[in-house]
Design a protein with these regions (language model features):
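Short, small-residue-biased leader/transition segments that mark boundaries at the very start
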Residues: 2-6
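Broad gene-expression machinery/nucleic-acid interaction feature
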Residues: 8, 26-30, 78-80
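Short helix/loop capping segments that flank catalytic or ligand/cofactor-binding pockets
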Residues: 15-18, 91
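Residue-level signal for pocket-adjacent positions within structured domains
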Residues: 16, 40, 102, 106
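Histidine-centered catalytic/metal-coordination loop motif
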Residues: 19-64
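Well-ordered alpha/beta subsegment
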Residues: 50-86
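Short terminal or interdomain "cap/linker" segment that borders an active site or interface and mediates
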Residues: 78-122
Length: 122
């Protein structure tokens, strides 16, 4: 049986850190899923990312929330979300490290153990 994977990459988003109310900026999301009989419009994935980022958040939770919504609307347990971005709470206050880019990865279903699928996220 043929297995199709759909991936949107470099989706721009931003949010605000719930700890410091500081901007998380230049964030890029990669969202992938293996359809379970239902394929959603590609713009929906970007809309989900925007919606989740528009509240006080942690980067880790953004990935989890996007994955939860993708699972709910597609019916697929095979979902992956990779987020990379800068945090002004790191670059503009405290330690002041401007080039520190944070990456979080949320892997579910087949993405957890399948190295080929994980390579597809790059």
């Amino acid at each position: 049986q043929r297995q199709m994977c759909i991936r949107d990459r470099d989706i721009d988003l931003f949010s605000y850190c719930e700890h410091h109310m500081a901007l998380m900026y230049d964030m890029k999301a990669t969202v992938a899923y293996i359809p379970n009989g239902k394929v959603i419009g590609l713009s929906k994935i970007a809309r989900i990312c925007d919606m989740v980022g528009r509240r006080l958040q942690l980067q880790e939770r953004i990935g989890q929330d996007i994955a939860d919504i993708m699972t709910e609307i597609t019916g697929s347990e095979d979902v992956a979300v990779v987020l990379e971005g800068y945090h002004s709470c790191v670059s503009a206050r405290g330690i002041k490290k401007n080039n520190t880019r944070t990456m979080t990865v949320e892997l579910r279903g087949s993405f957890k153990d399948d190295a080929a699928l994980q390579m597809y996220l790059r």
